[in-house]
Amino acid sequence: DTLSLHDALPIFMSDCVVVNHQMGSYLATKHLIELGHRNIACITGPSHLEATNGRIKGFKRAFEEKGLEQRKELIVEGNYHIESGYIGAQKILNIDPSITAIHVFNDMMAYGVFECFKDKGIKIPEQISVVGFDDIFFSKMLYVPLTTIALPIHHMGGKAVELLIERILNKSLSFRCNIVEPKLIIRKSTCDIQIQK
């Protein structure tokens, strides 16, 4: 028997602990919309990953709930590495340099976005707001601390151990999947659109 922590398939063939990816991106995008942003871009992960697809659904859902148009050309695919965040930001600026906010599907790519904007003299959040996803260690230490979506890693680890012990003690148990909820961590990389120049 196996135990997976991430990217479980829709039909679970093992015990698993997974993040509600859709809710995470929904919270990130809703935060930007509540700050008055409408021209919001997005850098995703690889399209074949279940986590990416869930996050895209959450991104779009936030627009749909408010009856807002979401421009498909402002969704750019990345690969969860820093350099793809840099390249993705360049692509988005080439498509529409008037964007006011960007949701990046992980913090590593957000670091690349920060570097791109720094190289181009674009100030965060005074000119563009940025929201990441994962809340990894260095995100709070960037030159502008990153607003992001936090994953309850310790809870996930504890739940995974709990499921594994129960599986060892009773191999006849049906497969179980525990879905954990992410939360929005607001730092300094987002601001109200009225404050932006």
What are these regions (language model features)?
Residues 1-9:
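Short, small-residue-biased leader/transition segments that mark boundaries at the very start
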Residues 11-15, 139-140:
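A short acidic, helix-capping loop that chelates divalent metal ions and anchors anionic groups
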Residues 16-27, 43-88, 103-111, 133-135, ...:
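Hinge/beta->alpha junction and helix N-cap segments in small-molecule ligand-binding domains
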Residues 31, 62, 116:
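Rossmann-fold NAD(P)-dependent oxidoreductase module
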Residues 33-36:
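Non-catalytic positions within long, well-ordered alpha-helices that form the structural scaffold/packing
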Residues 38-39, 70-74, 123-130:
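Short acidic capping loops at alpha-helix termini that bridge into adjacent secondary structure
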Residues 90-91, 95-197:
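Flexible loop/turn connectors
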